[in-house]
Amino acid sequence: MDGDTLSGFHYELIEAFARDHSLQVAITPEMSFNERLEGLANGRFDVIAYGILATSELKDSLLLTSPIVLNRQVLVQRKTDSPDDSLFIKSQLDLAGKTLNVVEGSPSILRIRNLGNEIGDTIYIKEVEKYGSEQLIALVAHGDIDYAVCEESIARAAADSLPQIDINTAISFTQFYSWGVSKQSPVLLDSLNTWLERFKKGKEYRKIYKRYY
């Protein structure tokens, strides 16, 4: 969301898909990832047009399209002028004992848990139900929370208007992200994959991609 206007990489992509198939698309902004999965399962949604990282947990819940974009999860925190600021995270090891805010049901939760195992210490996770990534970033910027984890592309877009945030600490490696459809919709999956294979080779996709990445 940009103010009261829907926008973004995935929005422009699903609009292009609908246009090319002479379909009317109804967009429902849903912050909670769990609610997205539930909406897909009960038929309220046809597609989760949002970057979904393929994990073994999710593969039991939905069908994933062919990869759409490369992205990674990053830590969002406030910049500091003090080298001794104990709140400022300089490396993943500094995350020990810290609490990271994420969108409820976010696939990044599994990665954060694994990261805790890698550094040999506990990283606490707070799932936020009513806010999306953009809102969590704003809460960090304004000092309401100290840390959030979200996709790098979203964080970079936000950093343009929130210069006080630091997004340089990676939480995950760069990985492919896909869209999701119901396990009962293999025909829709095939249609999306066929279209994506063709569309990603064209100028329009490159133009949209450059706008957000």
Question: Language-model segments: which ranges?
Answer:
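Extracytoplasmic small-molecule ligand-binding "clamshell" domains
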Residues: 1-60, 125-129
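Short beta-strand->loop
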Residues: 2-6, 97-105
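Hydrophobic residues within well-ordered alpha-helices
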Residues: 17, 40-41, 75, 95, ...
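A ligand-binding cleft/hinge motif common to bilobed small-molecule-binding domains
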Residues: 34, 38-41, 50-61, 111-118, ...
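Periplasmic-binding protein-like
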Residues: 69-77, 82, 129, 133-134, ...
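Flexible hinge/capping segments at coil-to-helix
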Residues: 79-100
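Ligand-binding clefts/hinges and TM-proximal coupling segments of bilobed small-molecule sensing domains
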Residues: 105-124, 128, 163, 167-168, ...
